[in-house]
Amino acid sequence: MAHSACGFSVALLGALLLGTARLLRGTEASEIALPQRSGVTVSIKLGNPALPVKICYIVMSRQHITELIIRPGERKSFTFSCSNPEKHFVLKIEKNIDCMSGPCPFGEVHLQPSTSELPILNRTFIWDVRAHKSIGLELQFATPRLRQIGPGESCADGVTHSISGHIDATEVRIGTFCSNGTVSRIKMQEGVKMALHLPWFHRRNVSGFSIANRSSIKRLCIIESVFEGEGSATLMSANYPGGFPEDELMTWQFVVPAHLRASVSFLNFNVSNCERKEERVEYYIPGSTTNPEVFRLEDKQPGNMAGNFNLSLQGCDQDAQSPGILRLQFQVLVQRPQDESNKTYMVDLSRERTMSLTIEPRPVKHGRRFVPGCFVCLESRTCSTNVTLTAGSIHKISFLCDDLTRLWVNVEKTLSCLDHRYCYRQSFKLQVPDYILQLPVQLHDFSWKLLVPKDKLSLMLVPGQKLQQHTQERPCNTSFGYHVTSTTPGQDLYFGSFCSGGSIEKIQVKQNSSVTLRAYAPSFQQEVSKQGLIVSYTPYFKEEGIFTVTPDTKNKVYLRSPNWDRGLPALSSVSWNISVPSNQVACLTVLKERSGLACQSGRAFMIIQEQQSRAEEIFSLEEEVLPKPSFHHHSFWVNISNCSPMNGKQLDLLFWVTLTPRTVDLAVVIGAAGGGALLLFALVLIICFVKKKKKVDKGPAVGIYNGNVNTQMPQTQKFPKGRKDNDSHVYAVIEDTMVYGHLLQDSGGSFIQPEVDTYRPFQGPMGDCPPTPPPLFSRTPTAKFTAEELAPSSPPESESEPYTFSHPNKGEIGVRETDIPLLHTQGPVETEE
């Protein structure tokens, strides 16, 4: 208890002492005296436009004021009415230096008055130097040098340098700088304005720069940036992010050790509307035979440069009506030359027409420490952090990078076939070319965009090795995988991510699709040669996709609906063709008990159909409980058809299939064998009885005379009349009904209506067609159909070839109509002879 009281007393005493110190600091008197003809003016003003609740005043001669100005030759004493004046007031010390009427005070610039003579406020020292247009002024900065910052950025220690120049009467901002950078000198012409901002807690008492006299530089300014080792610098054009002055020239000089290499990359730029001349950047590169080298701002900038070089930005004469703005922000990266920079790689895209290859940095976050950049160089000179190689050319590239794992390659290729008559049954292989695998940079994505004629053909993907669908229950752990997406206009349907080592034999997609090979580990280069997708064009089908699955006897096969976590698109249908070996039994299990789907219009169904017996079960996904685990002895279909769901009610289904060996009951086998033996014994008895009865009933043969039989020898007949006088050249038509009419009569004597088949497009052998869902707006309950009672939607088909017979007609057969109407359900039309 005593210890706690003691601690509280110490804390209270510290707070009182701190408050007393702040109170004394605010109430103690300050005195500022400025020498005559010093050119220095001191002003104390309120810093924030919105005054706080408790107003703080400057107290001078018992007067409370909010602004105080001290001019050369004046001495003033004052105090503050509050204990924290640094939160209310700012101090500005401005010195005007006239180099036009007299000599300039060149050399080190001092802080006048010194910081020890000033009250503890946020301070800004301003030096405004005016000179003739023909005189150049140079600001030299001591170590540590300056680092330019962009708009919205701040310095860690709060100390900033703002530098401006003059073009006639117009002030031009050169930039804002912090400490610890590479900028060592800034050369100006026609005067310079330098502002040093010091926070109230900073005890700095030197300016940190000096002014020197130079000859005319014939441009707006020259900024010198010195690199003593590896590092980077970000620099901006004058007035950035505003517009660069019209038709002006600005130069940056870079000092780089000879053993290091420098690369330039433009981070942000805009060009204006030029009437005359052209906006450009010019490089003076040591050893170049074409100095200066001229580039447009849109061009790839030089890289891998050894030693010092200059970069200049040249403006143009802008359009008076619509000038636009010219601005530039760029980065210079200096680093050690890498071994890869001496190697050249050939990328031959001369035979390609629809392929592009991009080398770019991986999205990795770096800390504050310097990280050497990674550049891709074309022809060893034009370097950039990312390069896109287009089709139709041979490209020579090299790398300026200390760690090539920080880069990766993305490739896109379009494969299209627009003539469905030519495309049908055509196939090709999706495989990564060898020249891409030989690059020292790892492949990230290789995307094939597959285009087919609309509503004419569909696509089928057949892998070299069966695929596994990536799920949370069984994730893919391979070095690469495939992402399959249907790219139908207006609807992108993501089928999922697949890897080798599964049970999916083929994937059929209705329309245009995108297949992306994504590499996850460098070892994929050794494994990808074993894999490959064969793409072929197949007859068009209406479902979004069809998966052909042959389950593994050792593992579960997990399958989930497309667009997982986003829901199957409205009014779309997907099927799975699941094969079951003859000696196995498949168990189908759905993960959820209910789908949680709510339809706005239409109905959603899940159909399970046996392919051999055509028996099927139909489940309403909106109203009913999803099917419980079911066993299937033969191959079967699983179909999911979606409705138009309500917002937030999406359709996602996950199910799996397992195989177990088929077992046979011994009692059933014995019973079947016994039944077969009894049946065979009964057949033998029946045959013996029939033969014995025939022998008893058999009598002697009896001859029968038939007087209607012609017993004369056949002779050649002659026509009693001429051809013109008889109808021997007219033939009667014998209908099938007159020959086979007795076969068309039922037990009642009436003729049976002929069976007329309808044309159906060929869809392969039995089992290749997924089940057809009920109409979208029907209210069909769950129905089960057996082999003896087929579903109405599946009419029986005869295995033999169907014949169609016309009905018999009581009228006479016309002699002029000899065609038999094979597909007509009515009798032949009567005609007059």
UniProtKB/Swiss-Prot annotation:
Q: Where in this protein does the record say Phosphotyrosine is found?
A: 731
Topology versus the membrane, per the UniProt entry? Answer: Single-pass membrane protein
- Comp. bias (Basic and acidic residues): 809-819
The subcellular localization recorded is: Cell membrane
**Where would I find glycosylation on this chain?**
122, 180, 205, 270, 310, 342, 386
Q: Which residues cross the membrane?
A: 667-687
Q: Where is this site: Cleavage?
A: 368-369
Entry comment on modification after translation: Phosphorylated on tyrosine by kinases of the SRC family such as SRC and YES as well as by the protein kinase C gamma/PRKCG. Dephosphorylated by phosphotyrosine phosphatases. Also phosphorylated by suramin, a heparin analog. Tyrosine phosphorylated in response to dissociation of integrin alpha-6 beta-4 from laminin-5. N-glycosylated.
Q: Which GO terms describe its cellular component?
A: plasma membrane
User: Which residue ranges are assigned to the Extracellular compartment in the record's topology?
Assistant: 30-666
| Cited InterPro entries | CDCP1, CDCP1_CUB_3rd_6th, CUB_CDCP1_1st, CUB_CDCP1_2nd_5th, CUB_CDCP1_4th, Sperma_CUB_dom_sf
Q: Name one Pfam family in it.
A: CUB_CDCP1_2
Q: List the disulfide bonds.
A: 476-499
List the Cytoplasmic topological domains: 688-833
- In the UniProt record, the signal sequence range is 1-29
Oligomeric and partner information = Interacts with CDH2/N-cadherin, CDH3/P-cadherin, SDC1/syndecan-1, SDC4/syndecan-4 and the serine protease ST14/MT-SP1. Also interacts SRC and PRKCG/protein kinase C gamma.
Q: What does this protein do?
A: May be involved in cell adhesion and cell matrix association. May play a role in the regulation of anchorage versus migration or proliferation versus differentiation via its phosphorylation. May be a novel marker for leukemia diagnosis and for immature hematopoietic stem cell subsets. Belongs to the tetraspanin web involved in tumor progression and metastasis.
Name of the protein in question: CUB domain-containing protein 1
